[in-house]
Amino acid sequence: MAVTRPPERSAEAVELIEGAGGRALVAPTLELKEAHTESLREVCRRADEWDLVIFTSQAAVESLFQLCREFAGKIRKDCLVAVIGPRTARVAGEHGLRVDIVPEDYTAEGLLDALTGLNIEGWKVALPRTLSARKVLPRGLEMMGAEVLVAEAYRSGLPEDTGPAEELIDGLLDGKVDAVTFTSPLTVENLFKIAGNRRKELIEVLKRVKVAAIGPITLRKLEEHGITAVTPERYTVKDMIAALAVSMGEDVD
């Protein structure tokens, strides 16, 4: 089973796959780089102004606290903290933040739904993230009347070393890979970019092997290319691997 996440985010998937008796192939198609931009510095400088801070990834939390270690102590006690899911909540908690909102649906849409019970009109909202993310969340917040600062906290791009991803493509085309997991639309798009002139052939192969997507947004990107994928009810790596294992006739405890 191939894992296309960045290496530093792959340990859980590898452990689950190997624990189920499979062999994990780490072939990152995405690289995350911290970006200590002026907009992120502004999030730190204005820490005591925020009514709501939203984190949609572990990388955003880690980048902000790398730049501004005292952030948790600088925000107001009545400032709410919202995160995309339980893993981001755990990382935020490790940095001293009290997490107030975790949506049931671990997507931007889920976060917006979780905020609908609040009147956030006029609120100052900090949203540190990658600028390559979808615009659904900031636009939705603005439609609710919030003043949103989207701060670039990290950059998502092709890995500097595409060798492992190229080996994955070779393995898929040679029939040596049984399944591939994707955890974001970018992991899908970047694999196709790395494939280059083998893109069409790769897409046809992915239509035949087992593919897992962590959630509906990633699934949608795959479906744009006619690729079907297993998607878990809860959008976590553990649930994705479990759903894939069941689909392949395995069992993950």
From Swiss-Prot:
Record GO biological process: protoporphyrinogen IX biosynthetic process; uroporphyrinogen III biosynthetic process
Gene it is expressed from: hemD
Gene Ontology molecular function, alphabetical: uroporphyrinogen-III synthase activity
Keywords attached to this entry: Lyase, Porphyrin biosynthesis
Pathway annotation from the record: Porphyrin-containing compound metabolism; protoporphyrin-IX biosynthesis; coproporphyrinogen-III from 5-aminolevulinate: step 3/4
Catalysis performed (reactions): hydroxymethylbilane = uroporphyrinogen III + H2O
UniProt-listed Enzyme Commission number(s): 4.2.1.75
Cystine bridges: none
Protein's name in the database: Putative uroporphyrinogen-III synthase
Pfam families according to UniProt: HEM4
Family, per entry: Belongs to the uroporphyrinogen-III synthase family.
Stored Gene3D superfamilies: 3.40.50.10090
Species whose genome carries this gene: Methanothermobacter thermautotrophicus (strain ATCC 29096 / DSM 1053 / JCM 10044 / NBRC 100330 / Delta H)
Family matches, as InterPro entries: 4pyrrol_syn_uPrphyn_synt_sf, 4pyrrol_synth_uPrphyn_synth, UROS/Hem4
